[in-house]
Swiss-Prot record:
InterPro entries assigned to the protein according to its UniProt record, in alphabetical order: DNA_Topoisomerase_II (IPR050634), HATPase_C_sf (IPR036890), Ribosomal_Su5_D2-typ_SF (IPR020568), Ribsml_uS5_D2-typ_fold_subgr (IPR014721), Topo_IIA (IPR001241), Topo_IIA-like_dom_sf (IPR013760), Topo_IIA_A/C_ab (IPR013758), Topo_IIA_A_a_sf (IPR013757)
Binding site for ATP: 106, 135, 163-165, 176-183, 396-398
Active-site residue numbers: 813
Protein name per UniProt: Putative DNA topoisomerase 2, mitochondrial
Domain Topo IIA-type catalytic: 722-1157
Amino acid sequence: MHRLRVLRHLKFCISTSHRTTVVLKNTRSFCNNIPSTSFASEAAAKYEKKSPTEHVLLRPDTYIGGVAMREDQIIWLRDSENRKMIAKEVTYPPGLLKIFDEILVNAADNKARDSSMNRLEVWLDRETARISVWNNGSGLPVEIHPTEGIYVPTLVFGNLFTSSNYDDSEIKTVGGRNGYGAKLCNIFSKEFIVETVDTRIKRRFRQKWYDNMKKCNEAEVVEILDETVKDYTKVEFVPDLERFQIDKLSDDVIDLIGRRVFEVAATLPRDVDVYLNGQKCDVDGFEDYVKMFNDSSSLLFLHPTPRWHVGVAKRNNFFGESHVVLPKIVSFVNNINTEKGGSHVDYVMDKIVNIIKPIVDSKLGDPTKSVKPAVIKNNLSIFINCLIENPSFESQTKETLTTKAKNFGSIFECDAKKTAEWAEQSGLIEDIVEEVLNMKKKKLPGKRVSVSSVRDIVKLEDAEWAGITGTAEKCTLILTEGDSAKALALAGLEVLGRETYGVFPLKGKLLNVSNLDDARASKNEEISNLLRILGLKFEDSNSITRESLRYGRLLILADQDEDGSHIKGLIVNFIHKFWPSLVHTDGFIQSFRTPLLKAKKGDKVRSFFSMNEYRKWADVEEGGKWKIKYYKGLGTSTSNEAREYFSDLDHHTVNFKYTGTTDDDAIRMAFDRDKSDERKEWIRRSENEITNEDDGKTEISYQEFVDGQLMQFGMVDLKRSIPSLIDGLKPSQRKILWTLLNNMDESTEIKVSQLAGAVAHRQSYHHGEESLVRTIIRMGQTFCGSSNLPLLQPIGQFGTRHEGGNDAASARYIFTALAPTTRLLFPQADDDLLQKNVEEGMVVEPTWLCPIVPLILINGTEGIGTGWSTKIANRNPIDIIDMIRRKIDSISTEYEIPPFYEEFRGKLEVVTPTKFISSGKIQLIRPERKNASTFSIEIVELPIGIWTSKYKEKLSKIVETLPVLEFSERHTEKRVHFRITLDRKKSSRFLQKSNSDLLNYFKLRTSLTENRVLFDRNGELKEFGNISEIAAEFFEVRRDLYEKRLKIQKEECEAKLIYVENQLNFIEMVTNGTIEIRSMGRNQLEEKLQEMGFRVDPMATIAKNSKKANYGYLLEMPVSRLTSDEMKRLEERKSRRRTELEAAESADWKSVWRSELDKLAEAVGNNRKS
């Protein structure tokens, strides 16, 4: 008992006190003696703690942009011989370039801190891979940090999250921000050396780290006696090439390092000389750098303030006599190459476009026509070098600026007159006008495929050029997931225009056509519409080309969740099944990706396209709270966000790429019904593999898509379709039940429609309230063939067996509540012991609930998921209760229990341990008189799962061939009763038939085969051979939970006893004068109580309520309680508490479990009587 109290006190200290370290040190030996529970090894395997350095090495893409080779990338490099920039294909590991860039930008940043800096040197040794960066100007202070107790350079270069840039109230125009920088280079290096001179105190500092910053030598600090030595800083490192999957520095890597050195030489002020391997970089400022891309005669250069240097050129241009297509964006912020642009590029580009647009519009000759901004932007190449105050970037790789324009710290004033003159003289205006006019002309000469063929497809927004010979290939059909996604796409067309983009919304999921022929597929309305919209024909399956279609490309706009991935897959499968050549054409099918969630803090906004990407970021994000908004459905995005997405189409579009027959095999495996065994193996494999979430790729093979996004859908689909062995529930059922258990008592009634809304809100459910309504109703149905132990009460019309429950009343008119047996199945004492899930930052339902009997065997289940299906029949609750009793008593349970359905009057026959025959009930009513002319047949029960209305359709066809004199139905709400009166002479053969023959003739027999597939306690899919195996696994989990419950109950009883004892002792000491309340302050009293062995509030401690874990329960007692009468009451309460503790100490899991089983069995019996 004493140890447990110490442990609770330790937990309190950890959460509230700065004395944590001391407490931990003093109690380490005690903690080591605490026995592990049965969950310890499982928890250790599942949860790991990594140091910051280990996390950087384990997840490098979060910090440095990835270590894998990026192949065949088009990069503009310097041609030193001809003094110009040229586009070249290179292959390189981006992370290696990033760690070099961190050191280079650090050196360049020193110019902003010390204007006297005038030299930066980079040395690169190809053979040893040793790189050094040296700069003059003020070095780092060579002093001991007063708080950390180590030298400042050691702190800055060898400890993550250290920076001089954290104070956002101080205006800075440097590249560093988050305290990673040079430390990342240190972590990814075999050797890392820092040397700096601080002439203020005449000290030189040198320190060496190695083995990925895991080890370092002592800092060498020497006094400088030479007065001529100036301040400098030098960083020298040898990158750990193995971590970048290379063994030496390739020509491409060396060229890219040289490019960055050259870029810094161009972006730094002109008074800073930059050298590479002793050779001065031959560039005279940013304007000179821009001229290396383009003839200076066709270049506009704007330099309104020292913080803004902007070059503008036509994208299609000439360098001398050579035609070149210039890069769309070349931009730098505080010497950082922002390769993907960002808010600074948008800011400058919009100002330039606003000047050029009116000029173009005036020359079009038609006041009703206007050039789209996107057309102008596509004709411009823009070069920017700017200084931004305290910049924010999309990620640590700093490729995209996210700072809002109002926070730039300066304004770019675009010279309108100079810009307009340049646009005219360079021929830009003429080029744009010609392009716009040609667009219009292209509508006329081509022959249009019949427009009337699609005019009746009401929801189609057809592209203006769709079906026109010569232009249709350029058209893209955006296929959206429903009407809300269509609205998003239409907002995007404001940016893209309607000439080449059409939109068509799909009604949910497309049909899986894998096992359909042309005729059957074309009968589907959705597929028929797509054939007409796209201009597809089944007979052209081998010869069809993009040029022959109405649209040359498909762009799928679906939700960013798993169901969205499934929709993409079904569309891919549709095209692949009938026109594989189109799938083999790269770029015919594209996917549009939107953020799954956004994080916002002040002006900063971060977008994430997958939970994996978000988690990596969240793991390392430091400081401040971010507001998270989830975009589970496309309808969540606003029209402004839609325009933002479509303005950056390249970033939001993913091309499907065909890489060979493995892609064909992957598509067939995912969708062909004959490939179920392969899908099972695929799913098994996925449980042990990390799937490829959207990692920012703009191109993906079909196999990557199947093994990544589709695999994730498969796992989610299985979890929706197949229940947990532990509670017998699927996720939606569990969310519904937990909402009621956690928020309402058994007597509370709630409208079904309101309950669905509450579940969606409280349990983070995103699949529509209609789906929840259907599940709630099923959970409350009591007719034969539904649940043996319904978890909810059906208050109102929840449907009957005649329609299989589909005749339930509207959710607005019916109510529900917990069924009387539900709390007996799920004891409230377990609620706080269950492991809760967290979704969207909110604590929701547990991973599984834990009933006192395996509910899956009582209520059964049925479900079909990806690759796997499950079917388990209902069984008698009393039989299952008896089986668990036998296991408690260690009596063998290696036997099968036959299926059982409440109120079923037919027969269930066992064929094999997993196969059963369900027979209805038929009665031959023989005539009482020998000469009677008629006799009757009555059908009074149907096989399990056969509903009355469906059977009536079948029966009607049977009796059509019989001499029926009368056919009547006498059903009640719960009973089936068909009566057929036949002519005796014409139907005498029936009088000779056995009951078995009659059952067969009237199709009153069905087979039921069990396929016992369930998720186990760890969430892994498992197939069980018999129900004893299911019961055995359930038993272990339930027993462990009882032991955990009893342990906690004992601790609570101890806490209650200590609470009363302490109050009693306190009152006694106050009344006898041992404690003088009046002469001491609160702090003195608390210290006194601690010295005397009083505990802080034991009830608050065990409840982990740190705010109340103090001495308030003693010191804040009213004076009226400090009496002998109160002491008597407390003595009585103490006696009761001691009795409760003794009962808790003597209780064992077997007796508690038996007691709860008895109560459940009694309730089941009472239900049957009623």
